[in-house]
């Protein structure tokens, strides 16, 4: 699992996130080592990856509950909601709202636009011609992670299982209103769980990550809903039109210092 959740979206240029989580998401891959994943865990996750990989267009919603640990040691939980639309190979849309968050990301095959409505700003960067390449560029160049990006790649398992050390099936449990295979995986800096629907549509229904890099081991939980594998998407969904309330800013690569600076250009 490399970048499965929304935690770091826009954080490099608009808002801070817990240092341990950000470091975990941008760290280099661990040295290659054969993962100890049982067949009972491997089969459901591979079925899910194959199912998602075979879909050119789909949408889903997510409820995200994230624990944050304050310097005092106190833990608080924030709740957010995300709507995501994918049109392979070169279109991606997401909108996240909720506690301390109102953000939008639009990828049209040529550029990625990221807007923060709370702060009244947006940025546009040139992007490669595929979703996979665009997400890699954002992560490597800007430290920005697309929402639930592991599940959006053309081959989800290629990134989802990166750095996994062990994997097992906990049992058959319910998540998101569906009967699922409940899977548990470990990595050096995180434990994570995945609920995959036991059906002809092996969709991810829930993800929970425990961050072992941060004091108190905070958790990040995402429950999926409203999967639509044959959506009729609006023609203008992947065209960003900034409102008058938004001011364009410059997004600078990580190597150039501060990620964002205010700008007056349109």
Outline where the language-model segments fall.
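N-terminal mature ectodomain segment of secretory-pathway/periplasmic proteins
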Residues: 30, 36-121
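Gly/Pro-enriched, hydrophobic low-complexity segments
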Residues: 39, 63, 113-114, 123, ...
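Bacterial N-terminal signal peptides
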Residues: 7-17
């Amino acid at each position: 699992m490399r970048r499965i959740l929304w935690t770091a979206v826009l954080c490099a240029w608009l808002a801070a996130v817990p240092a341990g989580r950000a470091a975990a998401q941008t760290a280099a891959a661990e040295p290659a080592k054969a993962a100890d994943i049982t067949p009972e865990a491997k089969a459901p996750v591979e079925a899910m990856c194959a199912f998602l990989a075979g879909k050119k267009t789909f949408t889903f919603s997510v409820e995200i509950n994230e624990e944050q640990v304050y310097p005092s040691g106190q833990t608080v939980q924030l709740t957010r909601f995300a709507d995501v639309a994918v049109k392979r190979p070169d279109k991606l849309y997401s909108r996240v709202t909720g506690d301390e968050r109102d953000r939008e990301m639009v990828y049209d095959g040529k550029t990625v636009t990221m807007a923060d409505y709370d702060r009244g700003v947006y940025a546009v960067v040139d992007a490669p011609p595929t979703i996979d390449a665009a997400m890699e560029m954002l992560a490597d160049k800007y430290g920005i992670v697309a929402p639930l990006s592991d599940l959006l790649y053309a081959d989800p398992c290629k990134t989802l299982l990166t750095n996994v050390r062990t994997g097992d099936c906990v049992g058959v449990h319910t998540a998101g209103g569906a009967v699922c295979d409940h899977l548990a995986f470990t990595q050096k800096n995180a434990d994570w769980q995945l609920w995959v629907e036991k059906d002809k549509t092996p969709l991810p229904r829930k993800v929970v990550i425990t961050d072992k890099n941060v004091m108190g081991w905070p958790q990040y939980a995402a429950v999926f809903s409203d999967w639509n594998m044959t959506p009729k998407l609006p023609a203008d969904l992947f065209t960003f039109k900034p409102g008058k309330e938004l001011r364009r800013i410059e997004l600078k690569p990580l190597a150039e210092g501060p990620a964002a600076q205010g700008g007056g250009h349109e």
